[in-house]
């Protein structure tokens, strides 16, 4: 099966986080300071993951564990203009030049919306955070699991369409494996919710002894204990959103024009020779990007795959390299959709960003942006005014 490496390529929001706490990978529009053309040539190498006999293949994902970080220097405050947060002429999707949102970014928003916004305003700080030891260990653990079931072979890509084609070919390779009862890893999912295109990558799909289709999400932790209820809420939202996207694909809700229009991809683009060759090896005959998209959508919607039956989160201790425990996540579709609608209302420009409530102000102590956060400063100002008002009436 084919898989996308990041060698000489921008970090991609398809490569969603799967094994840490609440960090996100910068998406294809990771920085508002430096942007790639919406449509252009991209030369480099992607990679093909050729599965070993027992299973499927995967995308390389990064990890999340996020303890207290070095505070942002005061010099960074000067670079953050008020209009960056409160400019109303364009929606945040437009201001940050986002064609889509990743599940990872929405999970960051679940933890703290202001932090997710500052991550986009200050991408250099985010990149530094991703180099921490805990994140690197999480990556290594996750990669070792991938390499248990797949080999990696490079594939030459020339355009953005080639890069996306590699990911679609991954899906086409994994679908029959999953239908046959095999375990697959790093399964891409996508869909349109509230008019916004959302992408993610499911860590693992498999059938249990009851015949239920199970989504398993790996999370590595520094602490040899299960996470707090606040972090558990983020993780449950993540797997719930994956289920919404996966179920939508198998139900045939995704249309090809959603992909072309939202991601600004050229439907008539001829696939590169390397991509066509690997597609042929998989028994897929597609000359253009549109032909490949059509093949994928027909295959997944007409497959024998059911909707996901069970969501579980597997916690793994970095220090001992052993399991901590597995949590079965509840799924309430109405609740997930309601939360998602609220989060997306910020990105579509219907409201201003919000920080944490006073009951969760403890999150600020481990936040990179504690010293520059406008929400936090305003909350302190309001609290001081309320305290002064109360004192004056004593």
UniProtKB/Swiss-Prot annotation:
Places the protein is found: Nucleus; Cytoplasm, Cytosol
Keywords: 4Fe-4S, Cytoplasm, DNA damage, DNA repair, DNA-binding, Exonuclease, Hydrolase, Iron, Iron-sulfur, Magnesium, Metal-binding, Nuclease, Nucleus
Keyword Membrane: no
Keyword Nucleus: yes
Signal sequence bounds: none
A single GO molecular function term of this UniProt record: single-stranded DNA 5'-3' DNA exonuclease activity
Residue ranges, compositional bias (Basic and acidic residues): 61-79
Principal cellular location given in the protein's record: nucleus
GO cellular component: cytosol; nucleus
Binding site for [4Fe-4S] cluster: 112, 364, 367, 373
Region (Disordered): 42-79
GO biological process: interstrand cross-link repair
Assembly and oligomerization: Monomer.
Entry-linked PANTHER family: EXONUCLEASE V (PTHR14464:SF4)
Annotated function: Single-stranded DNA (ssDNA) bidirectional exonuclease involved in DNA repair. Probably involved in DNA repair following ultraviolet (UV) irradiation and interstrand cross-links (ICLs) damage. Has both 5'-3' and 3'-5' exonuclease activities with a strong preference for 5'-ends.
The name this protein goes by in its record: Exonuclease V
Organism: Danio rerio
């Amino acid at each position: 099966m084919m898989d996308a490496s990041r060698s000489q390529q921008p970090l991609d929001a398809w490569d969603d986080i799967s094994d840490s706490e609440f960090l996100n990978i910068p998406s294809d529009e990771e920085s508002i300071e430096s942007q790639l053309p919406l449509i252009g040539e991209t030369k480099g190498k992607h990679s093909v993951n050729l599965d070993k006999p027992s299973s499927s293949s995967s995308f390389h994902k990064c990890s999340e564990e996020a303890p207290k970080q070095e505070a942002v220097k005061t010099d960074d405050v000067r670079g953050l203009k008020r209009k960056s947060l409160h400019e109303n002429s364009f929606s945040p999707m437009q201001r940050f030049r986002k064609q889509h949102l990743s599940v990872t970014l929405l999970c960051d928003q679940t933890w703290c919306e202001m932090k997710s916004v500052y991550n986009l305003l200050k991408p250099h700080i985010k990149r530094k955070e991703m180099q921490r030891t805990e994140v690197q260990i999480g990556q290594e653990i996750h990669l070792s699991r991938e390499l248990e079931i797949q080999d990696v072979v490079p594939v030459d890509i020339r355009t953005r369409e080639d890069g996306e084609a590699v990911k679609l070919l991954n899906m086409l390779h994994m679908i029959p494996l999953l239908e046959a009862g095999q375990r697959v890893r790093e399964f891409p999912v996508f869909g349109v919710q509230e008019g916004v295109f959302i992408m993610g990558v499911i860590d693992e799909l498999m059938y249990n002894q009851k015949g239920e289709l199970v989504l398993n999400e790996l999370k590595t932790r520094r602490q040899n204990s299960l996470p707090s209820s606040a972090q558990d809420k983020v993780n449950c939202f993540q797997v719930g959103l994956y289920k919404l996207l996966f179920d939508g694909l198998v139900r045939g809700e995704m249309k090809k024009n959603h992909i072309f229009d939202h991601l600004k991809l050229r439907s008539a683009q001829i696939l590169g020779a390397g991509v066509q060759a690997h597609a042929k090896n998989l028994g897929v005959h597609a000359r253009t990007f549109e032909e490949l998209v059509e093949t994928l959508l027909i295959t997944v919607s007409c497959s024998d795959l059911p909707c996901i039956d069970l969501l579980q989160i597997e916690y793994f201790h970095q220090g001992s390299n052993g399991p901590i425990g597995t949590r079965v996540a509840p799924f309430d579709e109405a609740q997930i959709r309601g939360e998602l609608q609220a989060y997306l209302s910020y990105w579509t420009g219907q409201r201003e960003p919000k920080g944490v409530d006073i009951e969760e102000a403890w999150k600020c102590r481990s936040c990179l942006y504690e010293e520059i956060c406008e929400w936090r400063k305003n909350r302190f100002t309001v609290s001081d005014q309320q305290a002064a008002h109360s004192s004056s009436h004593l």
